[in-house]
């Protein structure tokens, strides 16, 4: 995630803004509708990044364990390939010693296919995307990304396409989810990160976060982090239709002190507002899509025990994780380095109870939309927090260093791949 001096981009014309507003990104809880066929069960997939597994949990209630799948069945083959290539080895070790905090990153993001037959996984350290058969545990297809690291993904509303950020190549690939064939790609800012399809699948929003592994973390050195921007691409032609430079918007809002590296983000149900976190900040901002300006800011409490040394904050993330209730009334925030999560009222921006959590690194919405589920990467568990009360419901142990949590589907009665 690297940065150069930020580009200033001309404001979008009104017609384009209106078009994008009308086709704005879907709420975080939206998932592709399963294809007709064998009975499916909705579940939560939890990617255990340092372990290379995904735990599969009930999507509601007690988040009971359903099964587990190994998402690196080809580990030995991939390692041989890496160790025989000095350039690949250099990046592999670089990931381990920076973003990986001394560990390899084996699973970043996951989505299931519409028929519930496979889970598609981006694997940072292996610089690829794979489809793993849920019945056999074998790899159906593999797509090596450009460059040397794969990152966040997004699935199209119909479930047929998956987008993945190739973070060292400043590229987003869009793949056929069934075959792994590339349908197209587009260029981004430095270190592309989050991806979001619009509700009709027409546009794809990507945010780039720049270099979050350098130690040049003082506010006055923020410009060294690279070219950070939102790139909106046509998901059919893969041409860029809009670029949003948040540096200019933050300056206009009176917050030149804040980083313009956009981290997790959520759109309101009517898709008129974007809520986003930025590097080094304990809080989030509200952006009006039609008027192209930042309208509100929420600063959340600091944990007195959190170090003030910004170089100790993992990948520049003070707070990293956000989801919105399906009705748009509440935001769930993961306060990563401050070791809590909280539910915020969207109308008033008042936060609820601060729920203690150990390095929470993601937030998603459960299957019935009544709770958010956070990954506690420091404690190897996931925790459900009630949207209505802001109180913790349940915690469930998972594997080593859970990060991304996604809703998906598996065949009814599935408890894991068949042995052998």
How would you name each of these model-derived features?
Residues 1-4, 62-64:
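Short amphipathic alpha-helical segments with coiled-coil-like heptad repeat character
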């Amino acid at each position: 995630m690297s940065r150069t001096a930020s580009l200033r981009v001309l404001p979008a014309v009104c017609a384009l803004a209106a078009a994008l507003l009308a086709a704005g990104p879907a709420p975080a809880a939206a998932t592709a509708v399963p294809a007709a066929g064998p009975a499916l069960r909705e579940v939560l997939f939890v990617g255990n990044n340092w372990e290379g597994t995904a735990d599969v949990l009930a999507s509601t209630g007690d988040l009971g364990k359903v099964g587990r799948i190994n998402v690196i069945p080809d580990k030995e083959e991939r390692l041989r390939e890496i160790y025989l290539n000095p350039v690949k080895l250099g990046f592999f070790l670089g990931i381990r010693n920076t973003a990986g905090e001394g560990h390899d990153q084996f699973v970043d993001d996951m989505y299931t296919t519409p028929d519930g037959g496979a889970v598609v996984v981006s694997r940072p350290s292996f610089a690829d995307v794979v489809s793993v058969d849920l019945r056999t545990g074998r790899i159906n297809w593999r797509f090596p990304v450009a460059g040397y690291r794969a990152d966040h993904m997004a699935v199209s509303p119909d479930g047929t396409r998956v987008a993945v950020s190739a973070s060292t190549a400043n590229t987003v690939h869009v793949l056929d989810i069934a075959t792994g064939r590339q349908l197209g790609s587009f260029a981004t800012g430095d270190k592309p990160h989050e991806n979001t399809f619009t509700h009709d699948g027409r546009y794809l929003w990507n945010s780039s976060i720049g270099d979050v592994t350098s130690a040049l973390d003082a506010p006055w050195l923020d410009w060294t982090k690279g070219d950070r921007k939102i790139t909106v691409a046509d998901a059919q032609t893969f041409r860029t239709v809009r670029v949003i430079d948040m540096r200019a918007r933050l300056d206009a809002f009176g917050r030149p002190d804040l980083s313009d590296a956009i981290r997790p983000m959520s759109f309101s149900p009517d898709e008129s507002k974007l809520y986003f976190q930025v590097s080094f900040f304990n809080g989030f901002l509200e952006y009006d899509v039609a008027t192209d300006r930042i309208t509100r800011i929420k600063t959340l409490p600091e944990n007195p025990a959190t170090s003030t040394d910004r170089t100790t904050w993992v990948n520049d993330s003070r707070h990293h994780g956000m989801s919105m209730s399906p009705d748009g009334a509440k935001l769930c925030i993961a306060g990563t380095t401050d070791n809590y999560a909280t539910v915020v009222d969207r109308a008033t921006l008042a936060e609820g109870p601060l729920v203690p959590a150990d390095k929470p690194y993601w937030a998603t919405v459960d299957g019935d939309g009544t709770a958010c589920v956070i990954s506690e990467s420091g404690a190897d568990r996931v925790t459900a927090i009630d949207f209505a009360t802001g109180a913790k419901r349940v915690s469930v142990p998972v594997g080593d260093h859970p990060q991304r949590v996604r809703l998906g589907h598996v065949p009814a009665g599935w408890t894991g791949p068949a042995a052998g």
